Amino acid sequence: SIAGILNDKPIDTSMGLTPLEGLMMGSRAGNLDPGLVVFLGKKGFNLQKILNKESGFKSLVGKTDIQEIMKIGNKKSELALDIFVYKIVEYIGSYIAVLKGFDNLVFTGGIGENIPLIRKEICDSFGFLGLKIDKNKNSKNLEVISKKRSRVKVYVKKTDEELMIAKEVLNL
């Protein structure tokens, strides 16, 4: 998921009521035309199964693991990765517009923490805004991967979702 944050508070997120909205995932489509849901429903398809288990990377490449998809190297896998990066850039770009700029870009979660190529592709899209990453730092998954002269600081932050959930439960 992606969030636009202003003064330490999220102003928008890519997820809606369910994880179906937002970015394409391993087996989820992400944003789609509501008319498609109506069309498939009228045809008698199991929408729950299609939207949650058979969409996203799985529908394009037949696999859900992005590491495996990157190793395939054929036109389908390249298209799937291009779509994935494009949608991320689209979200970030819209948040930059709403926020009237950005100071930091933070990558986290499985893909954000562990796949330098995806981070590079995303960051390269914002080079025109003065965002510059250091290839060496990026390849090593260092905490700060932006160059010193970059107008935007780029971070790779490790997450521990289970710990965060446990802390929130203790606060109830």
Q: At which residue positions do the language-model features occur?
A:
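Glycine-rich phosphate-binding loop of actin/hexokinase-like ATP-binding domains
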Residues: S1-K42
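Conserved active-site and cofactor/substrate-binding residues in soluble primary-metabolism enzymes
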Residues: N31-G35, N46, V61-T64, K76-L79, ...
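Adenine-nucleotide phosphate-binding core of ATP-dependent small-molecule kinases
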Residues: K49, K53-L99
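Glycine-rich phosphate-binding loops at beta-strand->alpha-helix junctions
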Residues: D103-F126
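Active-site proximal loops enriched in glycine and acidic residues that flank catalytic Cys/His/Asp
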Residues: S14, G73, V106-I111, K158
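Glycine-rich phosphate-binding/hydrolytic loop that grips phosphoryl groups
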Residues: D134, N138-L172
